[in-house]
Amino acid sequence: FWSENTHLTVGGEEITVRAGSYVRLCRTFTAGESILLKLDMSLRAWAGEERMAGKASLFCGPLVLCADGYYDGRLNVEQLPALRAESLKLLRVEPSGFAGSTFTLECGGETLTLCDLYTAGSSGSAYTTWLPMTGIAPKPFARSNPFRLQKVGV
């Protein structure tokens, strides 16, 4: 559902992939053949409702991003600045000191380093997946978008 722009190459042959569906590979592979899967890693957000109103969970592809002071020492997860959904820009993704990655974003001329949910809190630090965000409204549930995600950023 989230990967609208997926590319799959099997043994050098491009395979058509439709968002929200599975691809079945029925073939005999030969030594040295490879499968290359490129997923849509654009930024998306899930707007919070009720007690999470005014906040959103941010995704980079299938990965949930988190604010964790260990990865960005300027962050206090209890007092995060509000991000503007329309101005978010992913600058870079780098391996973290653990098994996951860090994601450096720009928003309104400021940078912010987030981590993936897998490594969040692994140093014993506090973290949150719900980030204060403006310019985003909740989307209703739909079978075509069960996670109610929407593209954000530039």
Where are each of the predicted segments found?
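Active-site-adjacent structural elements in folded domains
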Residues: 22
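Beta-strand-rich binding/interaction modules
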Residues: 1-11
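Short loop/turn positions at the edges of beta-strands in beta-sheet-rich folds
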Residues: 2, 29-31
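C-terminal beta-rich recognition modules with glycine/proline-rich loops and embedded aromatic residues
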Residues: 10, 16-18, 27, 34-154
